[in-house]
Amino acid sequence: VVNKVDNFEKLMPDVYEFYNLGIGDPIPISAVGKLGIGEMLDEIVKHFPEDTQEDGEDDRPKIAIVGKPNVGKSSIINKMVGEQRVIVSDIAGTTRDAIDTPVVYNGREYVFIDTAGLRRKSKIKEELERYSIIRTVAAVERADVVILVIDATEGVTEQDAKIAGIAHERGKGMIIAVNKWDAIEKNDKTIYEHTQKIKDTLSFMPYAELLFVSAKTGQRLNKIYDMIDMVIESQTMRIPTGVLNEILTEAVAMQQPPSDKGKRLRIYYMTQVAVKPPTFVMFVNDKELTHFSYTRYIENKIREAFGFRGTALRFINRERKEKE
């Protein structure tokens, strides 16, 4: 267990150094930030004797429904489940706590986590409101796939972007459900224009899947399950090292890596080291020569080959001397 990983995105390269110990996969956590604790416990539980597990391992996909208050998160679950399991009213924040709702669809069971939504800091006056924010983050932590519900009549707000950022930093599968689509006047360009606005605002997660829905009419809600299945498949996909390096060789041949002061970046090979999200380590001659634009180019080539729709991809650069 590697503690003090307070920023997963920045510190993961350091975590992977612990592979050199040869005693298994390092588990990153932050005791202070309460990050990664669930994953650590999951690993511990895997080693419990089988006869002590009465219910077995819970492999049901966990879906966090998140968004700012009163965008229709609970209404979406109610429509999908077919009953009022979560009390809803038009007053923002009537869902006070995270509630797990199991749903069976086409023979597969899903667990939906509904939350009270994130509040603007200026409106937080009680500890209860602060607690609901913590629960939103906790729901994202527990989830395999995050469904961010936004209001079609408002577009992506600053708060929506903040919630999306939380899910992105934690490498969760991402679906954006644009609710209240029935309230929008439409022409043949409406979906395209809304899609472009959303992608421009959330440019840090171009991989996110979009779905235009209406909790009021039920429009397209039945497509959510297929989209969830697709995103989970992307999150757990493993690519053989040999296949990855065929793509890498072709990509390098088409566009040379960057150089600086006469020294060119060399990528010796790459391998996938993790899922949820899919994480790749690239062994290079000099990390200082790597550039995010070239990493994005490699990422795009991998996505062209395998899709990886709805999930972030992580890339770690590690130096390796040529003689090695």
Indicate residue ranges for each PLM-predicted region.
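Canonical P-loop GTPase G-domain recognition
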Residues: 5-62, 173-175, 182-242, 312-314
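Conserved G1/Walker A P-loop phosphate-binding module
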Residues: 17-20, 43-145
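Short, non-transmembrane amphipathic alpha-helical segments
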Residues: 198, 294-308
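A short amphipathic beta-strand at an alpha->beta junction
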Residues: 307-322
